UniProtKB/Swiss-Prot annotation:
Organism: Schizosaccharomyces pombe (strain 972 / ATCC 24843) (Fission yeast)
Active site positions: 236 (nucleophile), 530 (proton acceptor)
Keyword 4Fe-4S: no
Modified sites of kind Phosphoserine: 338, 343
Keyword DNA-binding: no
Subunit relationships: Interacts with sfp47.
Molecular-function GO terms, alphabetical: cysteine-type deubiquitinase activity; metal-dependent deubiquitinase activity
Record-linked Gene3D superfamilies: Cysteine proteinases
Protein name (Swiss-Prot/TrEMBL): Probable ubiquitin carboxyl-terminal hydrolase 4
EC main group: hydrolase
Protein backbone atom coordinates (compact mmCIF):
# COMPACT_ATOMS: atom_id res chain seq x y z
CA UNK A 1 0.00 0.00 0.00
CA UNK A 2 1.30 3.42 -0.91
CA UNK A 3 2.25 6.02 1.66
CA UNK A 4 -0.36 8.29 0.06
CA UNK A 5 -3.09 6.26 1.78
CA UNK A 6 -1.69 6.97 5.24
CA UNK A 7 -0.83 10.57 4.33
CA UNK A 8 -4.47 11.22 3.48
CA UNK A 9 -5.61 9.45 6.64
CA UNK A 10 -3.21 11.60 8.67
CA UNK A 11 -4.73 14.75 7.16
CA UNK A 12 -8.23 13.46 7.85
CA UNK A 13 -7.45 13.11 11.57
CA UNK A 14 -7.72 16.88 11.92
CA UNK A 15 -7.33 18.37 15.41
CA UNK A 16 -8.80 21.75 16.32
CA UNK A 17 -8.36 23.65 19.60
CA UNK A 18 -11.01 26.33 20.06
CA UNK A 19 -10.17 29.65 21.68
CA UNK A 20 -12.22 28.91 24.81
CA UNK A 21 -10.42 25.63 25.58
CA UNK A 22 -8.00 24.99 28.43
CA UNK A 23 -5.16 22.58 29.14
CA UNK A 24 -7.60 20.58 31.27
CA UNK A 25 -10.32 20.28 28.60
CA UNK A 26 -7.78 19.37 25.89
CA UNK A 27 -6.15 16.72 28.10
CA UNK A 28 -9.56 15.31 28.96
CA UNK A 29 -10.50 15.16 25.28
CA UNK A 30 -7.23 13.43 24.40
CA UNK A 31 -7.68 10.77 27.07
CA UNK A 32 -11.24 10.07 25.84
CA UNK A 33 -9.89 9.65 22.30
CA UNK A 34 -7.32 7.15 23.54
CA UNK A 35 -10.04 5.22 25.39
CA UNK A 36 -12.20 5.21 22.25
CA UNK A 37 -9.25 3.98 20.18
CA UNK A 38 -8.62 1.11 22.60
CA UNK A 39 -12.31 0.13 22.56
CA UNK A 40 -12.39 0.16 18.76
CA UNK A 41 -9.15 -1.82 18.60
CA UNK A 42 -10.68 -4.52 20.81
CA UNK A 43 -13.64 -4.66 18.41
CA UNK A 44 -11.23 -5.02 15.46
CA UNK A 45 -12.45 -1.72 14.01
CA UNK A 46 -8.90 -0.93 12.98
CA UNK A 47 -9.36 2.09 10.73
CA UNK A 48 -11.39 4.01 13.31
CA UNK A 49 -9.02 2.96 16.09
CA UNK A 50 -6.04 4.21 14.10
CA UNK A 51 -7.94 7.45 13.36
CA UNK A 52 -8.51 8.15 17.08
CA UNK A 53 -4.93 7.25 17.99
CA UNK A 54 -3.77 9.76 15.38
CA UNK A 55 -6.05 12.47 16.75
CA UNK A 56 -4.83 11.88 20.30
CA UNK A 57 -1.16 11.93 19.26
CA UNK A 58 -1.64 15.11 17.24
CA UNK A 59 -3.43 16.75 20.18
CA UNK A 60 -0.58 15.79 22.54
CA UNK A 61 1.74 17.64 20.16
CA UNK A 62 -0.56 20.66 19.71
CA UNK A 63 -1.24 21.38 23.39
CA UNK A 64 2.30 22.64 24.23
CA UNK A 65 2.22 24.69 21.01
CA UNK A 66 -1.00 26.38 22.05
CA UNK A 67 -0.47 26.85 25.80
CA UNK A 68 2.48 27.94 27.90
CA UNK A 69 3.09 24.92 30.11
CA UNK A 70 5.35 24.62 33.12
CA UNK A 71 5.41 22.59 36.32
CA UNK A 72 3.50 25.44 37.98
CA UNK A 73 0.79 25.50 35.30
CA UNK A 74 -2.77 24.78 36.37
CA UNK A 75 -3.71 21.17 35.53
CA UNK A 76 -0.08 20.39 34.62
CA UNK A 77 -0.48 16.92 36.15
CA UNK A 78 -3.46 16.11 33.92
CA UNK A 79 -1.52 17.07 30.81
CA UNK A 80 1.51 14.99 31.86
CA UNK A 81 -0.75 11.99 32.42
CA UNK A 82 -2.28 12.39 28.95
CA UNK A 83 1.16 12.88 27.42
CA UNK A 84 2.39 9.68 29.09
CA UNK A 85 -0.59 7.71 27.74
CA UNK A 86 -0.07 9.19 24.28
CA UNK A 87 3.57 8.08 24.22
CA UNK A 88 2.49 4.56 25.20
CA UNK A 89 -0.04 4.62 22.34
CA UNK A 90 2.59 5.23 19.65
CA UNK A 91 3.52 1.55 19.40
CA UNK A 92 -0.18 0.59 19.24
CA UNK A 93 -0.74 3.03 16.38
CA UNK A 94 2.20 1.56 14.44
CA UNK A 95 0.89 -1.99 14.99
CA UNK A 96 -2.53 -1.02 13.66
CA UNK A 97 -0.93 0.75 10.71
CA UNK A 98 0.83 -2.46 9.68
CA UNK A 99 -2.42 -4.43 10.04
CA UNK A 100 -4.27 -1.90 7.88
CA UNK A 101 -1.64 -2.25 5.18
CA UNK A 102 -2.08 -6.03 5.16
CA UNK A 103 -5.88 -5.81 5.31
CA UNK A 104 -6.08 -3.71 2.18
CA UNK A 105 -3.79 -6.10 0.37
CA UNK A 106 -6.28 -8.94 0.77
CA UNK A 107 -8.77 -9.36 -2.12
CA UNK A 108 -12.39 -8.77 -1.13
CA UNK A 109 -15.66 -9.83 -2.76
CA UNK A 110 -19.23 -8.74 -2.00
CA UNK A 111 -21.93 -11.33 -1.25
CA UNK A 112 -23.93 -10.46 -4.38
CA UNK A 113 -20.86 -10.92 -6.61
CA UNK A 114 -19.96 -14.20 -4.92
CA UNK A 115 -23.44 -15.60 -5.45
CA UNK A 116 -23.46 -14.51 -9.10
CA UNK A 117 -20.11 -16.19 -9.76
CA UNK A 118 -21.18 -19.40 -8.03
CA UNK A 119 -24.00 -19.78 -10.58
CA UNK A 120 -21.67 -19.57 -13.59
CA UNK A 121 -21.06 -23.01 -15.04
CA UNK A 122 -17.78 -21.84 -16.57
CA UNK A 123 -16.34 -21.14 -13.10
CA UNK A 124 -15.58 -23.65 -10.39
CA UNK A 125 -16.17 -21.68 -7.20
CA UNK A 126 -15.53 -23.25 -3.80
CA UNK A 127 -16.76 -21.66 -0.55
CA UNK A 128 -14.90 -22.15 2.74
CA UNK A 129 -16.94 -21.49 5.88
CA UNK A 130 -14.73 -21.12 8.97
CA UNK A 131 -16.71 -21.61 12.18
CA UNK A 132 -16.48 -22.38 15.88
CA UNK A 133 -20.17 -22.66 16.77
CA UNK A 134 -22.31 -25.45 15.32
CA UNK A 135 -25.05 -22.94 14.48
CA UNK A 136 -22.64 -21.18 12.12
CA UNK A 137 -21.59 -24.41 10.42
CA UNK A 138 -24.80 -24.61 8.41
CA UNK A 139 -24.58 -21.06 7.06
CA UNK A 140 -23.89 -21.85 3.39
CA UNK A 141 -24.12 -19.91 0.13
CA UNK A 142 -23.59 -22.82 -2.26
CA UNK A 143 -23.76 -26.60 -2.33
CA UNK A 144 -20.02 -26.44 -2.97
CA UNK A 145 -19.23 -25.28 0.58
CA UNK A 146 -16.74 -26.85 2.96
CA UNK A 147 -17.17 -26.07 6.66
CA UNK A 148 -13.82 -25.92 8.48
CA UNK A 149 -13.36 -25.47 12.25
CA UNK A 150 -11.51 -22.23 12.90
CA UNK A 151 -9.21 -24.13 15.27
CA UNK A 152 -7.59 -25.72 12.22
CA UNK A 153 -6.46 -22.32 11.04
CA UNK A 154 -5.56 -21.03 14.49
CA UNK A 155 -3.21 -23.95 15.10
CA UNK A 156 0.29 -23.95 13.65
CA UNK A 157 -0.44 -27.16 11.71
CA UNK A 158 -1.69 -26.19 8.24
CA UNK A 159 -2.02 -29.82 7.13
CA UNK A 160 -5.53 -29.93 8.61
CA UNK A 161 -6.66 -27.27 6.13
CA UNK A 162 -5.15 -29.28 3.27
CA UNK A 163 -7.08 -32.36 4.37
CA UNK A 164 -10.38 -30.48 4.14
CA UNK A 165 -9.50 -29.08 0.71
CA UNK A 166 -8.88 -32.61 -0.59
CA UNK A 167 -12.60 -33.32 -0.11
CA UNK A 168 -13.54 -30.73 -2.74
CA UNK A 169 -15.25 -32.33 -5.77
CA UNK A 170 -13.09 -30.29 -8.17
CA UNK A 171 -10.00 -28.15 -8.35
CA UNK A 172 -11.49 -24.67 -7.80
CA UNK A 173 -10.74 -21.71 -10.04
CA UNK A 174 -11.71 -19.48 -7.13
CA UNK A 175 -11.96 -19.98 -3.37
CA UNK A 176 -14.26 -17.69 -1.39
CA UNK A 177 -13.58 -17.61 2.36
CA UNK A 178 -15.96 -16.29 4.99
CA UNK A 179 -16.75 -16.50 8.68
CA UNK A 180 -20.14 -15.75 10.20
CA UNK A 181 -18.34 -15.11 13.48
CA UNK A 182 -16.08 -12.50 11.84
CA UNK A 183 -12.81 -14.32 12.45
CA UNK A 184 -11.25 -12.66 9.42
CA UNK A 185 -11.43 -9.28 11.11
CA UNK A 186 -8.25 -10.64 12.69
CA UNK A 187 -5.91 -9.52 9.91
CA UNK A 188 -3.09 -11.88 10.87
CA UNK A 189 -5.46 -14.86 10.66
CA UNK A 190 -6.82 -13.75 7.28
CA UNK A 191 -3.34 -13.21 5.89
CA UNK A 192 -2.23 -16.64 7.13
CA UNK A 193 -5.08 -18.29 5.19
CA UNK A 194 -4.43 -16.14 2.13
CA UNK A 195 -0.75 -17.14 2.04
CA UNK A 196 -1.61 -20.80 2.56
CA UNK A 197 -4.13 -20.89 -0.31
CA UNK A 198 -1.83 -18.95 -2.63
CA UNK A 199 0.92 -21.49 -1.97
CA UNK A 200 -1.49 -24.11 -3.34
CA UNK A 201 -1.91 -21.98 -6.47
CA UNK A 202 -5.51 -21.18 -5.55
CA UNK A 203 -7.28 -17.84 -6.05
CA UNK A 204 -8.65 -16.83 -2.61
CA UNK A 205 -11.09 -14.00 -1.89
CA UNK A 206 -12.63 -12.92 1.39
CA UNK A 207 -16.36 -12.32 1.41
CA UNK A 208 -17.67 -9.29 3.26
CA UNK A 209 -20.68 -10.14 5.40
CA UNK A 210 -22.30 -6.74 5.80
CA UNK A 211 -24.88 -8.10 8.22
CA UNK A 212 -23.82 -11.56 9.38
CA UNK A 213 -26.60 -12.16 11.88
CA UNK A 214 -29.06 -14.77 10.73
CA UNK A 215 -32.54 -13.33 10.24
CA UNK A 216 -35.73 -14.54 8.67
CA UNK A 217 -34.78 -14.35 5.00
CA UNK A 218 -38.32 -13.38 4.05
CA UNK A 219 -38.01 -10.36 6.34
CA UNK A 220 -34.59 -9.27 5.11
CA UNK A 221 -34.29 -5.58 4.28
CA UNK A 222 -32.67 -6.74 1.04
CA UNK A 223 -36.20 -7.68 -0.04
CA UNK A 224 -37.53 -4.16 0.53
CA UNK A 225 -39.27 -2.50 -2.39
CA UNK A 226 -41.15 0.80 -1.99
CA UNK A 227 -44.85 0.00 -1.75
CA UNK A 228 -47.82 2.33 -1.48
CA UNK A 229 -49.88 2.85 1.68
CA UNK A 230 -53.64 3.25 1.39
CA UNK A 231 -55.07 6.64 2.38
CA UNK A 232 -57.66 5.88 5.05
CA UNK A 233 -59.14 9.37 5.00
CA UNK A 234 -56.74 12.33 5.37
CA UNK A 235 -53.94 10.01 6.51
CA UNK A 236 -51.40 11.18 3.93
CA UNK A 237 -49.53 12.90 6.79
CA UNK A 238 -48.89 9.49 8.38
CA UNK A 239 -48.20 7.60 5.16
CA UNK A 240 -45.42 9.92 4.01
CA UNK A 241 -43.68 9.84 7.40
CA UNK A 242 -43.77 6.04 7.45
CA UNK A 243 -42.30 5.85 3.93
CA UNK A 244 -39.35 7.98 5.05
CA UNK A 245 -38.83 5.90 8.20
CA UNK A 246 -38.89 2.66 6.19
CA UNK A 247 -35.82 4.06 4.39
CA UNK A 248 -33.92 4.47 7.70
CA UNK A 249 -31.97 1.20 7.69
CA UNK A 250 -30.54 1.73 11.17
CA UNK A 251 -34.10 1.67 12.48
CA UNK A 252 -35.68 -1.05 10.35
CA UNK A 253 -32.86 -3.62 10.18
CA UNK A 254 -32.47 -4.00 14.00
CA UNK A 255 -36.23 -4.52 14.24
CA UNK A 256 -35.96 -7.43 11.81
CA UNK A 257 -33.02 -9.17 13.47
CA UNK A 258 -34.74 -11.89 15.43
CA UNK A 259 -37.26 -9.37 16.79
CA UNK A 260 -34.48 -8.11 19.03
CA UNK A 261 -36.08 -4.74 19.72
CA UNK A 262 -39.45 -6.29 20.59
CA UNK A 263 -37.73 -8.29 23.32
CA UNK A 264 -36.32 -5.08 24.83
CA UNK A 265 -39.60 -3.19 25.31
CA UNK A 266 -39.67 -1.39 28.66
CA UNK A 267 -43.25 -2.13 29.72
CA UNK A 268 -42.69 -0.43 33.09
CA UNK A 269 -42.03 3.00 31.59
CA UNK A 270 -45.19 5.11 32.21
CA UNK A 271 -44.19 7.45 29.38
CA UNK A 272 -44.28 4.61 26.84
CA UNK A 273 -47.14 2.71 25.25
CA UNK A 274 -46.39 -0.67 26.74
CA UNK A 275 -44.96 -1.72 23.40
CA UNK A 276 -48.14 -1.02 21.42
CA UNK A 277 -46.62 1.48 18.99
CA UNK A 278 -43.43 -0.58 18.60
CA UNK A 279 -45.28 -3.82 17.90
CA UNK A 280 -47.64 -2.06 15.48
CA UNK A 281 -44.73 -0.59 13.56
CA UNK A 282 -43.01 -3.99 13.41
CA UNK A 283 -46.21 -5.60 12.09
CA UNK A 284 -46.55 -2.92 9.43
CA UNK A 285 -42.91 -3.36 8.47
CA UNK A 286 -43.54 -7.10 8.11
CA UNK A 287 -46.45 -6.39 5.77
CA UNK A 288 -44.29 -4.08 3.67
CA UNK A 289 -41.56 -6.70 3.27
CA UNK A 290 -43.99 -9.54 2.62
CA UNK A 291 -46.15 -7.65 0.12
CA UNK A 292 -45.49 -10.25 -2.62
CA UNK A 293 -45.95 -7.84 -5.50
CA UNK A 294 -48.93 -5.87 -4.19
CA UNK A 295 -49.11 -2.24 -5.31
CA UNK A 296 -50.18 -1.05 -1.86
CA UNK A 297 -51.15 -2.24 1.61
CA UNK A 298 -53.43 -0.82 4.27
CA UNK A 299 -51.90 0.62 7.47
CA UNK A 300 -55.29 0.44 9.22
CA UNK A 301 -54.13 -1.59 12.22
CA UNK A 302 -51.22 0.78 12.77
CA UNK A 303 -53.53 3.80 12.48
CA UNK A 304 -55.97 2.36 15.02
CA UNK A 305 -53.16 1.93 17.54
CA UNK A 306 -51.98 5.51 16.92
CA UNK A 307 -55.50 6.89 17.37
CA UNK A 308 -56.04 4.89 20.55
CA UNK A 309 -52.92 6.55 21.96
CA UNK A 310 -53.55 10.06 20.64
CA UNK A 311 -56.98 11.21 19.50
CA UNK A 312 -55.47 14.27 17.81
CA UNK A 313 -54.68 12.05 14.83
CA UNK A 314 -58.26 11.77 13.64
CA UNK A 315 -59.19 10.75 10.10
CA UNK A 316 -61.82 13.51 10.09
CA UNK A 317 -59.44 16.48 10.11
CA UNK A 318 -56.13 17.78 8.79
CA UNK A 319 -53.11 16.59 10.78
CA UNK A 320 -49.51 17.74 10.63
CA UNK A 321 -46.81 15.33 9.43
CA UNK A 322 -44.20 16.85 11.75
CA UNK A 323 -46.46 16.46 14.79
CA UNK A 324 -47.02 12.80 13.91
CA UNK A 325 -43.28 12.23 13.39
CA UNK A 326 -42.50 13.79 16.79
CA UNK A 327 -45.21 11.70 18.46
CA UNK A 328 -44.07 8.44 16.89
CA UNK A 329 -40.35 8.85 17.61
CA UNK A 330 -41.08 9.96 21.18
CA UNK A 331 -43.29 6.95 21.93
CA UNK A 332 -40.95 4.54 20.18
CA UNK A 333 -38.11 5.91 22.30
CA UNK A 334 -40.04 5.57 25.55
CA UNK A 335 -41.06 2.00 24.66
CA UNK A 336 -37.42 1.05 24.12
CA UNK A 337 -35.78 3.31 26.72
CA UNK A 338 -33.71 0.97 28.88
CA UNK A 339 -32.59 3.80 31.19
CA UNK A 340 -36.05 5.24 31.90
CA UNK A 341 -36.12 4.09 35.53
CA UNK A 342 -32.92 5.87 36.57
CA UNK A 343 -33.48 8.72 39.01
CA UNK A 344 -32.79 12.29 37.82
CA UNK A 345 -29.75 14.30 38.91
CA UNK A 346 -30.34 16.85 41.67
CA UNK A 347 -30.54 20.45 40.35
CA UNK A 348 -27.30 22.46 40.48
CA UNK A 349 -26.72 25.25 42.97
CA UNK A 350 -26.15 28.85 41.86
CA UNK A 351 -22.40 28.49 42.46
CA UNK A 352 -22.29 25.29 40.41
CA UNK A 353 -24.20 26.96 37.58
CA UNK A 354 -21.75 29.85 37.63
CA UNK A 355 -18.71 27.54 37.59
CA UNK A 356 -20.22 25.55 34.73
CA UNK A 357 -20.32 28.68 32.56
CA UNK A 358 -16.51 28.82 32.71
CA UNK A 359 -16.14 25.48 30.94
CA UNK A 360 -15.23 25.34 27.23
CA UNK A 361 -18.45 24.87 25.27
CA UNK A 362 -17.40 21.55 23.73
CA UNK A 363 -16.55 20.18 27.19
CA UNK A 364 -19.80 21.53 28.62
CA UNK A 365 -21.74 19.87 25.78
CA UNK A 366 -20.08 16.49 26.42
CA UNK A 367 -21.05 16.57 30.11
CA UNK A 368 -24.66 17.53 29.37
CA UNK A 369 -25.00 14.85 26.71
CA UNK A 370 -23.80 12.15 29.10
CA UNK A 371 -26.31 13.39 31.67
CA UNK A 372 -29.03 13.04 29.05
CA UNK A 373 -27.91 9.49 28.23
CA UNK A 374 -28.11 8.63 31.92
CA UNK A 375 -31.90 8.42 31.63
CA UNK A 376 -32.32 8.05 27.86
CA UNK A 377 -30.99 5.03 25.99
CA UNK A 378 -32.73 3.63 22.91
CA UNK A 379 -32.37 3.07 19.18
CA UNK A 380 -34.10 6.43 18.69
CA UNK A 381 -31.48 8.26 20.77
CA UNK A 382 -28.67 6.42 18.99
CA UNK A 383 -29.87 7.46 15.55
CA UNK A 384 -32.22 10.45 15.62
CA UNK A 385 -31.34 12.62 18.62
CA UNK A 386 -28.89 15.51 18.51
CA UNK A 387 -28.18 18.37 20.89
CA UNK A 388 -28.81 22.12 20.72
CA UNK A 389 -26.96 24.76 22.72
CA UNK A 390 -28.66 28.03 23.69
CA UNK A 391 -26.38 30.75 25.05
CA UNK A 392 -27.53 34.15 26.31
CA UNK A 393 -24.97 36.86 27.10
CA UNK A 394 -25.55 40.10 28.99
CA UNK A 395 -24.42 43.05 26.87
CA UNK A 396 -23.52 45.03 30.01
CA UNK A 397 -21.39 42.70 32.15
CA UNK A 398 -20.78 39.80 29.76
CA UNK A 399 -22.32 37.13 32.02
CA UNK A 400 -23.54 34.10 30.08
CA UNK A 401 -26.24 31.53 30.66
CA UNK A 402 -25.93 28.30 28.68
CA UNK A 403 -28.43 25.49 28.35
CA UNK A 404 -28.42 22.31 26.29
CA UNK A 405 -31.42 20.39 25.00
CA UNK A 406 -31.86 17.26 22.87
CA UNK A 407 -33.68 17.46 19.53
CA UNK A 408 -35.05 14.93 17.05
CA UNK A 409 -35.82 17.45 14.32
CA UNK A 410 -34.34 20.83 13.54
CA UNK A 411 -37.01 23.49 12.91
CA UNK A 412 -35.49 26.19 10.71
CA UNK A 413 -37.15 29.37 9.39
CA UNK A 414 -37.66 30.28 5.74
CA UNK A 415 -38.28 33.79 4.40
CA UNK A 416 -41.66 34.53 2.85
CA UNK A 417 -40.44 35.54 -0.62
CA UNK A 418 -41.22 34.59 -4.22
CA UNK A 419 -37.71 33.61 -5.33
CA UNK A 420 -35.83 30.38 -4.60
CA UNK A 421 -34.14 30.24 -1.18
CA UNK A 422 -31.22 27.91 -0.42
CA UNK A 423 -31.11 25.61 2.59
CA UNK A 424 -27.86 27.29 3.62
CA UNK A 425 -29.69 30.64 3.87
CA UNK A 426 -32.29 29.03 6.14
CA UNK A 427 -29.58 27.49 8.34
CA UNK A 428 -27.79 30.83 8.65
CA UNK A 429 -31.04 32.47 9.71
CA UNK A 430 -31.58 29.72 12.29
CA UNK A 431 -28.18 30.33 13.90
CA UNK A 432 -28.23 34.15 13.63
CA UNK A 433 -27.90 35.96 17.01
CA UNK A 434 -31.13 37.35 18.45
CA UNK A 435 -31.13 40.68 20.30
CA UNK A 436 -33.17 40.70 23.52
CA UNK A 437 -34.01 44.21 24.70
CA UNK A 438 -36.76 46.32 26.23
CA UNK A 439 -39.65 44.23 27.51
CA UNK A 440 -37.98 41.17 26.00
CA UNK A 441 -34.69 41.82 27.81
CA UNK A 442 -32.87 39.22 29.92
CA UNK A 443 -32.76 39.29 33.72
CA UNK A 444 -29.01 39.09 34.35
CA UNK A 445 -28.10 37.18 37.57
CA UNK A 446 -25.03 39.42 38.03
CA UNK A 447 -26.58 42.83 37.28
CA UNK A 448 -29.76 41.75 39.14
CA UNK A 449 -31.87 43.74 36.66
CA UNK A 450 -33.27 43.27 33.18
CA UNK A 451 -30.60 43.94 30.55
CA UNK A 452 -30.20 43.89 26.80
CA UNK A 453 -28.69 40.57 25.82
CA UNK A 454 -27.64 38.53 22.81
CA UNK A 455 -29.02 35.03 22.38
CA UNK A 456 -27.71 32.44 19.94
CA UNK A 457 -28.79 28.86 19.26
CA UNK A 458 -26.16 26.44 17.97
CA UNK A 459 -26.03 22.77 17.05
CA UNK A 460 -23.62 21.18 19.52
CA UNK A 461 -24.08 17.52 18.54
CA UNK A 462 -25.36 16.04 15.31
CA UNK A 463 -27.39 12.79 15.13
CA UNK A 464 -26.86 9.92 12.73
CA UNK A 465 -30.07 10.87 10.92
CA UNK A 466 -30.67 14.60 10.66
CA UNK A 467 -34.32 15.58 10.26
CA UNK A 468 -34.94 19.18 9.24
CA UNK A 469 -38.36 20.82 9.38
CA UNK A 470 -38.86 23.86 7.15
CA UNK A 471 -41.14 26.20 9.10
CA UNK A 472 -43.69 26.77 6.35
CA UNK A 473 -46.57 27.39 8.74
CA UNK A 474 -46.56 30.55 10.83
CA UNK A 475 -49.00 32.16 13.23
CA UNK A 476 -49.75 35.89 12.94
CA UNK A 477 -52.51 38.26 14.01
CA UNK A 478 -54.33 37.13 10.86
CA UNK A 479 -54.18 33.49 11.95
CA UNK A 480 -52.11 30.61 10.57
CA UNK A 481 -50.52 31.04 7.16
CA UNK A 482 -48.49 28.81 4.87
CA UNK A 483 -45.20 30.06 3.36
CA UNK A 484 -44.86 28.78 -0.22
CA UNK A 485 -41.28 30.00 -0.79
CA UNK A 486 -39.52 27.54 -3.15
CA UNK A 487 -36.52 25.78 -1.57
CA UNK A 488 -33.43 25.04 -3.66
CA UNK A 489 -32.38 21.38 -3.94
CA UNK A 490 -29.67 20.45 -1.43
CA UNK A 491 -28.48 16.85 -1.83
CA UNK A 492 -25.61 17.15 0.66
CA UNK A 493 -24.80 19.26 3.71
CA UNK A 494 -21.26 19.32 5.18
CA UNK A 495 -21.20 19.11 8.97
CA UNK A 496 -19.05 22.23 9.19
CA UNK A 497 -22.04 24.17 7.83
CA UNK A 498 -24.13 22.92 10.75
CA UNK A 499 -21.75 22.85 13.71
CA UNK A 500 -19.88 26.05 14.75
CA UNK A 501 -16.10 25.93 15.44
CA UNK A 502 -16.64 25.96 19.22
CA UNK A 503 -18.13 22.46 18.96
CA UNK A 504 -15.95 21.13 16.16
CA UNK A 505 -13.30 20.60 18.82
CA UNK A 506 -15.67 18.30 20.70
CA UNK A 507 -14.73 14.78 21.79
CA UNK A 508 -17.26 13.06 19.54
CA UNK A 509 -17.15 15.37 16.53
CA UNK A 510 -16.10 13.70 13.27
CA UNK A 511 -16.20 15.74 10.04
CA UNK A 512 -19.08 14.38 7.97
CA UNK A 513 -21.39 14.94 5.05
CA UNK A 514 -25.15 14.59 5.40
CA UNK A 515 -26.76 13.07 2.31
CA UNK A 516 -30.42 13.54 1.41
CA UNK A 517 -32.33 10.24 1.17
CA UNK A 518 -35.96 11.27 1.70
CA UNK A 519 -38.19 14.31 2.01
CA UNK A 520 -41.84 15.18 2.54
CA UNK A 521 -43.69 17.83 0.55
CA UNK A 522 -46.87 19.70 1.40
CA UNK A 523 -49.09 20.93 -1.41
CA UNK A 524 -52.11 23.19 -1.12
CA UNK A 525 -53.25 25.26 1.83
CA UNK A 526 -53.66 24.53 5.53
CA UNK A 527 -57.30 23.49 5.30
CA UNK A 528 -57.11 21.25 2.25
CA UNK A 529 -53.45 20.36 1.77
CA UNK A 530 -51.86 17.05 0.79
CA UNK A 531 -48.58 15.34 1.74
CA UNK A 532 -46.37 13.23 -0.53
CA UNK A 533 -42.86 11.83 -0.08
CA UNK A 534 -39.81 11.27 -2.27
CA UNK A 535 -37.50 8.44 -1.15
CA UNK A 536 -34.12 7.31 -2.47
CA UNK A 537 -34.04 3.56 -3.12
CA UNK A 538 -31.14 1.72 -4.78
CA UNK A 539 -29.75 5.03 -6.07
CA UNK A 540 -33.09 5.86 -7.69
CA UNK A 541 -35.62 8.38 -6.40
CA UNK A 542 -39.23 7.23 -5.96
CA UNK A 543 -42.20 9.60 -5.76
CA UNK A 544 -44.77 8.13 -3.33
CA UNK A 545 -48.29 9.56 -3.18
CA UNK A 546 -50.20 7.32 -0.75
CA UNK A 547 -50.85 4.10 -2.73
CA UNK A 548 -49.09 5.28 -5.90
CA UNK A 549 -45.35 4.71 -6.32
CA UNK A 550 -43.50 5.92 -9.41
CA UNK A 551 -39.91 6.65 -10.36
CA UNK A 552 -38.85 10.30 -10.38
CA UNK A 553 -38.04 11.30 -13.96
CA UNK A 554 -34.74 13.02 -13.28
CA UNK A 555 -32.98 15.82 -11.43
CA UNK A 556 -35.39 18.41 -12.86
CA UNK A 557 -38.42 16.60 -11.43
CA UNK A 558 -36.61 16.02 -8.14
CA UNK A 559 -35.73 19.71 -7.91
CA UNK A 560 -39.38 20.61 -8.54
CA UNK A 561 -40.59 18.27 -5.78
CA UNK A 562 -37.94 19.52 -3.35
CA UNK A 563 -38.98 23.15 -3.88
CA UNK A 564 -42.17 22.40 -1.90
CA UNK A 565 -40.43 20.27 0.74
CA UNK A 566 -41.51 20.51 4.36
CA UNK A 567 -39.50 17.81 6.17
CA UNK A 568 -36.04 16.69 5.03
CA UNK A 569 -34.23 13.47 5.99
CA UNK A 570 -30.42 13.32 5.80
CA UNK A 571 -28.07 10.44 6.69
CA UNK A 572 -24.59 11.00 8.05
CA UNK A 573 -21.60 9.78 6.11
CA UNK A 574 -18.39 10.55 7.99
CA UNK A 575 -15.41 11.62 5.94
CA UNK A 576 -13.61 8.67 7.51
CA UNK A 577 -16.25 6.26 6.13
CA UNK A 578 -16.09 7.92 2.72
CA UNK A 579 -12.31 7.62 2.82
CA UNK A 580 -12.58 3.91 3.63
CA UNK A 581 -15.02 3.35 0.75
CA UNK A 582 -12.83 5.16 -1.76
CA UNK A 583 -9.42 3.99 -0.57
CA UNK A 584 -7.51 1.65 -2.89
CA UNK A 585 -7.80 -2.01 -2.00
CA UNK A 586 -7.65 -5.23 -4.00
CA UNK A 587 -11.14 -6.27 -5.12
CA UNK A 588 -12.58 -8.77 -7.53
CA UNK A 589 -11.25 -8.11 -11.00
CA UNK A 590 -13.84 -10.10 -12.99
CA UNK A 591 -16.91 -8.55 -14.58
CA UNK A 592 -20.06 -9.83 -12.95
CA UNK A 593 -23.12 -9.88 -15.19
Amino acid sequence: MSDDYFDRLFELAFVYINEDETIQSCSFRGQRWLEEAQTLEQKNSLLKAYYYYLKALKLAYEIPCRFEISVKSTHYGEFKQFQKLAIQAVSKAFTIKSKLAVKHYLPVIQISDALSLSKKSSLKVLFLNFYSQESSKGYVFSKHTIAIPISCLQSMDSSKIYDFLKSAPFHPSMVICYSLERYFEDVSLAYKLYSMLRSLKLDPHFMELANPKKVDSSLSYENYQPIGLTNLGNTCYMNCVLQCLFACKDLTIPMLQGRGLLQNINTKNPLGTGGKITSAFFSLLQSVLLNHGQRSISPRNFLEIVQSLNRDFSIDGQCDAQEFLNFFLDKLHEDLNSNASRSPIAPLTEDQLSAREELPLSHFSHIEWNLHLRSNKSIVVNNFVGQLCSRTQCMTCGRTSTTFAPFTSLAIPIDDVSHVVSLQECLLKFSAPELLQGHDGWHCPVCKVQRSAKKVIMISKLPEYLIIQIQRFKISVMGRKKIDTPLGLSLQIPSKMLVPPSFQSGIGYIPSNYNLFAFICHYGQLENGHYISDVLFNNEWCHIDDSIVRTVGGITDLREDFSSSYILFYKRSSLLEEFEDKCPKMTLKRNVK
